[in-house]
């Protein structure tokens, strides 16, 4: 049996953007595997998560927060509605706008997915205490805002 040669030590420190990109892909892969048993994809899980925190968003508002086109978000919403996870209803103040909220089943599925994702995040951050986790989160959120991709008013 041949052994695989060890990888050479890095001669330079990797760029933070590269490491964050690798982490993003790894997290997406893990979340995809965790939510699939519930019939969700990462975009569906993301949409449900945002709707939990901001019920009543329109398709266009939700698309902006999920970084997808309104057309792509509409496809996600059609699937979520067919699965009974969301409710779409006309906005009270605008006849053409449709507001989206979670159904009771949507809240239950999201809670189950959140438990699985929290477990994964806890494993990923096992070497950090609460203060270290807060410091990491604050630094990452700051980076997001400085690049103009914030989560809304800070």
Task: List each language-model region with its residue ranges.
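Short alpha-helical "packing" element that flanks the helix-turn-helix/winged-helix DNA-binding module
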Residues: 47-48
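Central "turn" residue of the DNA-binding helix-turn-helix
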Residues: 39, 55-56, 67, 129
């Amino acid at each position: 049996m041949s052994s695989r040669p060890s990888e050479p030590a890095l001669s330079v420190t990797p760029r933070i953007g590269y490491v964050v990109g690798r982490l993003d892909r790894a997290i997406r892969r893990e979340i995809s595997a965790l939510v699939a048993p519930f019939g969700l994809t990462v975009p569906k899980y993301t949409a449900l998560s945002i709707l939990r925190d901001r019920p009543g968003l329109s398709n266009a508002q939700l698309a902006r927060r999920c970084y997808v086109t309104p057309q792509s978000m509409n496809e996600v919403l059609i699937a979520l509605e067919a699965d009974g996870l969301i409710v779409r209803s006309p906005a009270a103040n605008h006849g053409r706008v449709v507001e989206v909220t979670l159904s009771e089943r949507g809240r239950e599925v999201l809670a189950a997915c959140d438990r699985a994702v929290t477990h994964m995040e806890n494993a990923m951050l096992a070497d950090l205490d609460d203060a270290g986790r807060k410091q990491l989160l604050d630094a990452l959120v700051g980076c997001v805002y400085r690049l103009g991709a914030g989560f809304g008013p800070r």
